[in-house]
């Protein structure tokens, strides 16, 4: 009897857990969208210059996960000129 009651509560509990945990996990991966990275980040200026020289228009930044890395920011230039993301509407 107790096993049936436990198993009937287990599925809804797992579903609620999945609904709570999945957005947290997916949100954490988008905090620092790196396209390219180099191990060891000594300064932001050096990292930014390195990423700009590699062709990343938005440059780069030092990010620490388990150790500091130089994270080159993803180029989403086409989204900057999108009329949906622009707060100014012109006719």
From Swiss-Prot:
GO BP term, example? killing of cells of another organism
The signal peptide annotation in the UniProt record is 1-27
Gene Ontology cellular component annotations, sorted alphabetically: extracellular region
- Cystine pairs annotated here are 34-72, 41-62, 47-70, 51-71
Compartments, record wording: Secreted
User: What keywords would UniProt list here?
Assistant: Antimicrobial, Disulfide bond, Fungicide, Plant defense, Secreted, Signal
Which superkingdom does the taxonomy of this entry point to? Answer: Eukaryota
Its family remark reads: Belongs to the DEFL family.
Q: State the name under which the record lists this protein.
A: Defensin-like protein 82
Q: Organism source for this protein?
A: Arabidopsis thaliana (Mouse-ear cress)
